[in-house]
Amino acid sequence: MVKLVFARHGESEWNKANLFTGWADVDLSEKGTQQAIDAGKLIKEAGIEFDQAYTSVLKRAIKTTNLALEAADQLWVPVEKSWRLNERHYGGLTGKNKAEAAEQFGDEQVHIWRRSYDVLPPAMPHDDEYSAHTDRRYASLDDSVIPDAENLKVTLERALPFWEDKIAPALKDGKNVFVGAHGNSIRALVKHIKHLSDDEIMGVEIPNFPPLVFEFDEKLNVVKEYYLGK
């Protein structure tokens, strides 16, 4: 059976500070760096050998991928980066403290923005310091596909082509795959993989550690799902 390992990036500096991060390119905290290394150690202990790895274009996921593969003694494995694996774009909430946002907009409204499947947060202005429209890493994209805010529904619509074009074909080809990504881009793909309803996915949380493993049959039906080390 082929294996797909999802590793959410280790704790970031903004996770630690309780800030909405989204597409802001925030680094790992010291704890997050260690979580990424520990993820790789668990992979090595489990004897999982990868043929292909994918990650986003955000440094916290890229570093997690590299650190985990290094700790697993598999740093040679090919890694492809894609914006389609980026975290959900939190729009105008990006950079705001979650508690302060609740004070400003109300607990209920912020909860809806965070947890609703299809409600968008306020859009990020194009002149915002965190806007992707002026970020060189997205220069090859048509401006119309760069989001100003996303919910989980839109995140799945954005990530799904990468699943269908890259990840799923690799798995069907018998390759074990590592995906170093983000809480919500992983949740979106888990929704698709497990055929979860819009309501069911809202109760799913992806921790920074440990990695989540799916084992598939040749038709990509889930045979087994578990967290490494548990």
From Swiss-Prot:
<dbReference type="GO" id="GO:0006096">
    <property type="term" value="P:glycolytic process"/>
</dbReference>
<dbReference type="InterPro" id="IPR029033">
    <property type="entry name" value="His_PPase_superfam"/>
</dbReference>
<feature type="binding site">
    <location>
        <begin position="87"/>
        <end position="90"/>
    </location>
    <ligand>
        <name>substrate</name>
    </ligand>
</feature>
<feature type="active site" description="Tele-phosphohistidine intermediate">
    <location>
        <position position="9"/>
    </location>
</feature>
<keyword id="KW-0324">Glycolysis</keyword>
<feature type="binding site">
    <location>
        <begin position="114"/>
        <end position="115"/>
    </location>
    <ligand>
        <name>substrate</name>
    </ligand>
</feature>
<dbReference type="InterPro" id="IPR013078">
    <property type="entry name" value="His_Pase_superF_clade-1"/>
</dbReference>
<comment type="similarity">
    <text>Belongs to the phosphoglycerate mutase family. BPG-dependent PGAM subfamily.</text>
</comment>
<keyword id="KW-0413">Isomerase</keyword>
<feature type="binding site">
    <location>
        <position position="98"/>
    </location>
    <ligand>
        <name>substrate</name>
    </ligand>
</feature>
<feature type="binding site">
    <location>
        <begin position="183"/>
        <end position="184"/>
    </location>
    <ligand>
        <name>substrate</name>
    </ligand>
</feature>
<protein>
    <recommendedName>
        <fullName>2,3-bisphosphoglycerate-dependent phosphoglycerate mutase</fullName>
        <ecNumber>5.4.2.11</ecNumber>
    </recommendedName>
</protein>
<dbReference type="Pfam" id="PF00300">
    <property type="entry name" value="His_Phos_1"/>
</dbReference>
<dbReference type="InterPro" id="IPR005952">
    <property type="entry name" value="Phosphogly_mut1"/>
</dbReference>
<comment type="pathway">
    <text>Carbohydrate degradation; glycolysis; pyruvate from D-glyceraldehyde 3-phosphate: step 3/5.</text>
</comment>
<feature type="binding site">
    <location>
        <position position="60"/>
    </location>
    <ligand>
        <name>substrate</name>
    </ligand>
</feature>
<feature type="site" description="Transition state stabilizer">
    <location>
        <position position="182"/>
    </location>
</feature>
<keyword id="KW-0312">Gluconeogenesis</keyword>
<feature type="binding site">
    <location>
        <begin position="21"/>
        <end position="22"/>
    </location>
    <ligand>
        <name>substrate</name>
    </ligand>
</feature>
<feature type="binding site">
    <location>
        <begin position="8"/>
        <end position="15"/>
    </location>
    <ligand>
        <name>substrate</name>
    </ligand>
</feature>
<dbReference type="GO" id="GO:0006094">
    <property type="term" value="P:gluconeogenesis"/>
</dbReference>
<dbReference type="GO" id="GO:0004619">
    <property type="term" value="F:phosphoglycerate mutase activity"/>
</dbReference>
<comment type="function">
    <text>Catalyzes the interconversion of 2-phosphoglycerate and 3-phosphoglycerate.</text>
</comment>
<feature type="active site" description="Proton donor/acceptor">
    <location>
        <position position="87"/>
    </location>
</feature>
